[in-house]
Design a protein with these regions (language model features):
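Membrane-interface helix-loop junctions in multi-pass transporters/channels
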Residues: 1-114
Length: 114
């Protein structure tokens, strides 16, 4: 195992997870998790499009920070726990995340090629 990439991912993951936790404490509820997942998808789209061969930055920001920031498991548990809003919650999260990732990639490409 390479220690430098592992440390970079761990540091980024700590930043992302603590940020998600702080937001969920400040703004409790399923819609905060939906917003976090959509925002994380947007930012990951930007990172994926903008960062070239710099492996450590991609690992820090993509796998670490944004991997720790977003959460599929909490999304799934929230959907099960809130059956009355589950369909809307799932649709908003999935469609929003896909649209945000696409928009982030387009923005990242535009920024990279300017």
């Amino acid at each position: 195992m390479e220690y430098k990439p592992t440390a970079v991912v761990a540091a980024g993951g700590a930043v992302g997870a603590v940020t998600r936790y702080a937001l969920s404490v400040q703004f409790p509820g399923i819609w905060t998790i939906a917003a976090i997942n959509v925002a994380g998808s947007l930012l990951l789209g930007v990172v994926a499009a903008m960062l070239g061969p710099d492996r450590l930055w991609r690992l820090f920001l993509g796998v670490g920070v944004l991997g720790g920031f977003t959460t599929f498991s909490t999304f799934a548990v929230d959907a099960v726990r809130h059956p009355a809003t589950a369909v809307v919650y799932v649709a908003v999260t999935l469609v929003g995340a896909l649209a945000a990732a696409r928009a982030g990639m387009a923005a990242g490409e535009a920024w990279r090629h300017r």
